[in-house]
Amino acid sequence: STPPKTLFPYTTLFRSKKNVQNPQTTAAGSENTAETTAVLKQQIKVAALKGPTAIGMVQLMENAKEQTAKNDYEFQIAATADEFSADLIKGNVALAALPCNAAATLYNKSNGKIRILGINTLGVLSILDTGDSVQTVADLKGKTIYTTGKGTTPEYTLRYLLSSAGLNPDSDVTIEFKSEAAEVAAVMANAGTEEVIAMLPQPYAATVLMQQPDTRIALDVTEEWEKLNGSDSTVVTGVLVVNTEFYKNNRQAVDDFLKEYKSSVQYVNSNVDGAAQLVEDFDIFKAAVAKKAIPKCNITLITGQEMQDKVEKYLKVLCDANPNAVGGQMPDDGFYVK
């Protein structure tokens, strides 16, 4: 059974009105019609996942609720991308934030019905350590690393990171997979005096740090990846995509959305406390966790050629590990809005 969607139907609740001044009738009876200013806002449905990929837009969500956004946005926060992918391909959802490899898969499977506008979240993975022996990726040699996501992007990311540091992921380390982040957290909680190393995404890493003060973030996977592979290569977790048909017919609305999204990202990164409260208000996750997680979520907005370069390099890593991770093949040039 799929979890219920959290839907914020601002379109219906907060419909923007035309600002029309009433014509004033003078004593002489002649009508003096004041200048009429009509502001018609476009209704646009936006979807995102309950997690780091939605964090960057919380201020925009708040503005939409307060009717101060440029358009009439309706936001859907879903547990998985499957909840809105069909609507995105059909155009019922115009814009969405979702995992990078899910976007590539949708593009390939729908024959180009969606396009990518920008990167909105870089890496959200951290390597946690209950001791202090891990300072670099090379220090993981001979260790056991607990993590989740066997056969998915976290595994491919970890293996590539280890390989980049000259370690063999199959013989130099032991990767112990658990089915859920909560199980990994439990292993760390029950560590006692034994050192436990784990790789977890936000907000789970933040939750572990709150529950276990002795645990530390030993490595930020994104930072280490860039150190080993150069800054033009990075971990790309979340991207913003647009329905191709909607983009063709509504360039101005898409440009406006990107401008508002960029402001929202700047707000989130510079006002962590305020943003954390909004994350809780919109039922993405709790404010206390968000406060710890936001600085480690690498929330951003990267567009144009830089976006394409980073996305292509990251998807190539996934595609080399398993072509199915990106929908069977690397997406062609038409995937990118430049």
Predicted regions and their residues:
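Secondary-structure end/capping motifs
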Residues: 247-321
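A bilobed periplasmic-binding-protein/Venus flytrap-type ligand-binding module shared by bacterial periplasmic
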Residues: 59-61, 125-134, 234-253, 300
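Short, solvent-exposed loop/beta-turn-alpha elements that line the ligand-binding surface or hinge
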Residues: 64-71, 223-233, 299-308
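Short, small-residue-biased leader/transition segments that mark boundaries at the very start
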Residues: 2-13
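Pocket-lining segment of extracytoplasmic ligand-binding domains
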Residues: 101-102, 110, 182-278
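Conserved C-terminal helix/tail region of periplasmic/extracytoplasmic solute-binding proteins
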Residues: 312-338
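Short, high-confidence coil segments that cap the C-terminus of an alpha-helix
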Residues: 93, 193-195, 318
